């Protein structure tokens, strides 16, 4: 599974007030954080690039996870510091 938080790239497609530096957290059904990322190139860059789904901006976040057990999960996107704005969360099931 690849989860992405896209913000800065939205500006190029005309989305106003795009979140300029999103962070991403993935939580399990108990609310426990199972993964987090700020700036996708800081963690798992090689593996994320190999999927062909790397975010278009270095400030965007991505988490590459081993297959998740069936169940409910929550993705939380926040801006760093006091940043606010519009972001998109994308979840990809990889082969």
Feature roles, as predicted:
Residues 93-95:
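Boundary/junction segments of secreted and surface-exposed precursor proteins
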């Amino acid at each position: 599974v690849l989860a992405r938080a896209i913000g800065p790239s939205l500006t190029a497609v005309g989305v106003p007030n795009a979140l300029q530096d999103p962070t991403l957290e993935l939580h399990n059904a108990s609310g426990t954080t199972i993964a987090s990322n700020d700036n996708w190139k800081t963690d798992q860059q090689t593996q994320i690039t190999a999927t062909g789904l790397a975010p278009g901006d270095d400030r965007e976040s991505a988490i590459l996870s081993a297959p998740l057990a069936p169940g409910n999960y929550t993705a939380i996107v926040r801006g760093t510091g006091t940043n606010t704005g519009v972001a998109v969360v994308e979840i990809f099931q990889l082969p």
